[in-house]
Amino acid sequence: MRDVLEVLEFPRVRALLAERAKTPLGRELALALAPLPREEAEKRHELTGEALSYPYALPEAGTLREAYGRALAGARLSGPELLKAAKALEEAMALKEELLPLKNALSQVAEGIGDHTPFLERVRKALDEEGAVKDEASPRLAQIRRELRPLRQQILDRLYALMDRHREAFQDRFVTLRRERYCVPVRAGMAQKVPGILLDESESGATLFIEPFSVVKLNNRLQALRLKEEEEVNRILRDLSERLAKDEGVPKTLEALGLLDLVQAQAALARDLGLSRPAFGERYELYRAFHPLIPDAVRNSFALDEKNRILLISGPNMGGKTALLKTLGLAVLMAQSGLFVAAEKALLAWPDRVYADIGDEQSLQENLSTFAGHLRRLREMLEEATSHSLVLIDELGSGTDPEEGAALSQAILEALLERGVKGMVTTHLSPLKAFAQGREGIQNASMRFDLEALRPTYELVLGVPGRSYALAIARRLALPEEVLKRAEALLPEGGRLEALLERLEAERLALEAERERLRRELSQVERLRKALAEREARFEEERAERLKALEEEVRAELLKVEAELKALKEKARTEGKRDALRELMALRERYAKKAPPPPPPPGLAPGVLVEVPSLGKRGRVVELRGEEVLVQVGPLKMSLKPQEVKPLPEAEPGKPLLAKPRREVKEVDLRGLTVAEALLEVDQALEEARALGLSTLRLLHGKGTGALRQAIREALRRDKRVESFADAPPGEGGHGVTVVALRP
């Protein structure tokens, strides 16, 4: 069987990972990535998570590995090569010091980086910043170079003095090297004035490069010292190369750097593709999973557990069934290889083996047919798969007679279920869909198809078998009705199954629309509840402020009364009791009076329809409570200030708006909408018609395949706002229009 990694396109995942590696070591590890033991894979997941939260810089490990390999082979490295290797080791040790304090999985990997201090110290002493060997590299080299410098200067002084004495004989006043010996440029016709050895001449022949006899011995001595210098430099470089080769910590350092690069590449892949860390358990449960190799892939959620071990997926061709199989297979392989997986959340079992029969794997050498190739792979599954295995089978039962293929496929599914195997299977065979419906251990599923647009949506629908849509598409494309009816008659069982599936689909869409309506209502109630809570909080705050102000007012009034009483007592004492009593009675009457109740706000009365601008909602006045108005908004009652509500113009004060409903007809055009969109429009139209007091609603849905009409009627049948519904008269739209009578 073709390697499952190839079948599931895992090498393409490796390639994406290798693109994100920064060193040859990391790229090689990425391209060789394969499933690991569980403990090691989980450690890689931990490392990837830490690399996502803690980015770090990597040294140039490729240069280090190349230099180390050459040194091991006995080569003498150049100064720059040794310097680059030393720099990489120094950066590796710095990275180790950076990661060790983290005390996590990354720090454990960093512990593998060795201590290369002896080699680094020797390199720093021997080489300068350009990689040239320094004088201090050895006493002998220092001595040789001490002799070289004055000798070189002595040669230059003699040659410049010679040129100054015979200026006419020289082309230019400069000293140059030819054959590693110092010489001067002499005009071709003046050679007799400069006795010496001809070393070279210019291309034009106008200049001769002559080594004067006066510096021959000095040049000879200089050449001898240079040979000694070169010999000592080579010895020093050879010594450094041997020190690098003998550093036993280098291989472990390279291994640690390679893994740190791979982990960083895995983190980059997870960040770029939106992957998440998987958890492991006894079942497969993926939430919003997607194919990591398909741009903008549709996300789907599904589960494989003891109740539903096998998912049987059906539906139209090119609808995404095979991609879904690969989505699960790649998620498992990526998780077992230490990668994050393509899902928002993933719980995965750890299969002992993944079996995949996907695509045409016909063997030309063995001359096997497509069907025989499938059987060969299926036989391996039946013989070897265990309850801990994962099987992925594409187009089970294809490539042979449909009846025999269906019978054989059912037997294979029964055998796999008996073994307790978990997996995904795709098929076009209707008998297999019927077999899976209600069968323990296996669940029907399908890939959704948009009949209006005639294209797949790639969305997985659990619990519902898929349809071929051949007849539905033919009807949508206006094939003659008599041909379609004859086709349905020729396939009675298939026709009944398709009709059943069509009804199930319509019911499912109606239920989805109902659920969406309830969700919107619940969301609206929650918004109202929140707004009411905020209003109550503001009210309590204002009430507390008013109480405080009232207390201060009462306190001030009491002080005033006390002052007046004191004055009256004084007056009674000095002027007589009768006048004081008269003033006391007047004071008592003043404080005994009650303020008249405030008049009701204009335009507001029980039953009046009002708008609450702060909520964007309408409600009805229930009661006037002094300075507040009790308003019914949907299922909630709330106390509001008069300025917080606005009477609607058409409302008559004191009378409910619906006391005299207008018997108008509202018409809604649903043609061209999807089923879900149409059902939302119908729900909104029913709500508006009820608020406006309409008695009738006309829904224009067209005839088409009938799926939209059936879905709408399923929703109307469940709606408590609807009294009845029927087709419009033949002259007013007939089957293409549904007339709805609303409850009063």
Swiss-Prot record:
Function of the molecule: Endonuclease that is involved in the suppression of homologous recombination and may thus have a key role in the control of bacterial genetic diversity. Cleaves the phosphate backbone of oligodeoxynucleotides non-sequence-specifically at the 3' side of the phosphates. Preferably incises the branched DNA structures, especially the D-loop structure over the Holliday junction. Has ATPase activity. Binds to dsDNA but not to ssDNA.
Ranges in a coiled coil: none
EC number of the protein: 3.1.12.-, 3.6.4.-
Domain comment as written in the entry: Contains an N-terminal DNA-binding domain, followed by a dimerization domain and a C-terminal domain, called the small MutS-related (Smr) domain, which is absent from MutS and contains the endonuclease activity. The Smr domain can also bind DNA.
Listed Pfam families: MSSS, MutS_V, Smr
Domain Smr: 668-743
SUPFAM superfamilies on file: DNA repair protein MutS, domain III, P-loop containing nucleoside triphosphate hydrolases, SMR domain-like
Record note on quaternary structure: Homodimer. Interacts with MutL. Binds to stalled ribosomes, contacting rRNA.
Domain of life: Bacteria
Record-level GO BP terms: mismatch repair; negative regulation of DNA recombination; rescue of stalled ribosome
GO molecular function, one term: rRNA binding
Signal peptide bounds: none
List of residues binding ATP: 315-322
Protein activity control: Nuclease activity is stimulated by interaction with MutL. ATPase activity is stimulated by dsDNA.
Family as reported in the entry's similarity comment: Belongs to the DNA mismatch repair MutS family. MutS2 subfamily.
Name of the protein described by the UniProt record: Endonuclease MutS2
Record note on disruption phenotype: Disruption causes an increase in the frequency of recombination between perfectly matched sequences.
Keyword NAD tagged: no
Transmembrane helix keyword on record: no
